[in-house]
């Protein structure tokens, strides 16, 4: 495998994997890529975040349809309010990805220095407090690191650059549909990291279960 997997080449880039564990799993790639971020660490429970980290929002009922599941963002600011025992996060997102009519009262919107972007600001309480929390999700961080994500999680998303990691121990889990989902996440740059034996076995398995036309489409996509 190439060390390129652990380094960004362009701003809007993602690494897609099937497995979470191991050297080339989602967890380790996220850890290494976050480690290359020179900004200060902020530890919230067992999680660590830095300004500049790439994130994806989770399906959090707290934000209704505003900050929705799989919304891409970048952490622009983190501040700790020790007196009120909470954290404040400012996240930069695509302006056209949200409808301001759905903005909850506990989310502020701020101008971004980047054209086509908008910043959203909200707090996360350090502890669950039924008396102070407006809902039961006020102490839950509503996003995860997203330098690397699963192929399943990437459905419906697009990135300028996509790097797909396929190790020999998970190649039997790669169906044609999973592989096609992965390679079609890339708008422009696409790289697949696998060894020649894995590539041969995967395409042989596709050949047995799918038409030659389907395989030709996939091969053509990889050449683009």
PLM region spans:
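Core RecA-like ATPase module of SF1/SF2 helicases and allied nucleic-acid translocases
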Residues: 2-224
């Amino acid at each position: 495998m190439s060390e390129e997997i652990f380094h960004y080449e362009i701003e809007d880039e993602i690494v897609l994997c099937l497995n979470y564990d191991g050297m080339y799993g989602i967890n380790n790639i996220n850890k290494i890529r976050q480690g290359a971020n020179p900004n200060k660490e902020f530890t919230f429970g067992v999680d660590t975040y830095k300004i500049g980290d790439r994130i994806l929002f989770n399906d959090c009922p707290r934000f209704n349809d505003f900050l929705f599941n799989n919304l891409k963002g970048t952490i622009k600011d983190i501040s700790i309010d020790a007196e009120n025992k909470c954290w404040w996060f400012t996240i930069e997102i695509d302006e056209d990805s949200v409808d301001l009519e759905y903005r909850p009262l506990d989310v502020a919107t701020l101008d971004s220095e980047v054209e086509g972007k908008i910043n959203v600001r909200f707090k996360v309480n350090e502890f669950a407090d039924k008396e102070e929390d407006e809902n039961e999700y006020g102490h839950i961080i509503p996003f995860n690191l997203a330098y690397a994500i699963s192929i399943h999680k990437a459905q419906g998303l697009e990135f300028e650059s996509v790097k797909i990691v396929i190790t020999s121990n998970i190649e039997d889990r790669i169906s044609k549909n999973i592989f096609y989902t992965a390679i079609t996440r890339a708008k422009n740059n696409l790289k697949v990291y696998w060894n020649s034996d894995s590539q041969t076995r995967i395409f042989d398995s596709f050949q047995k279960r799918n038409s030659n036309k389907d395989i030709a489409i996939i091969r053509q996509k990889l050449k683009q």
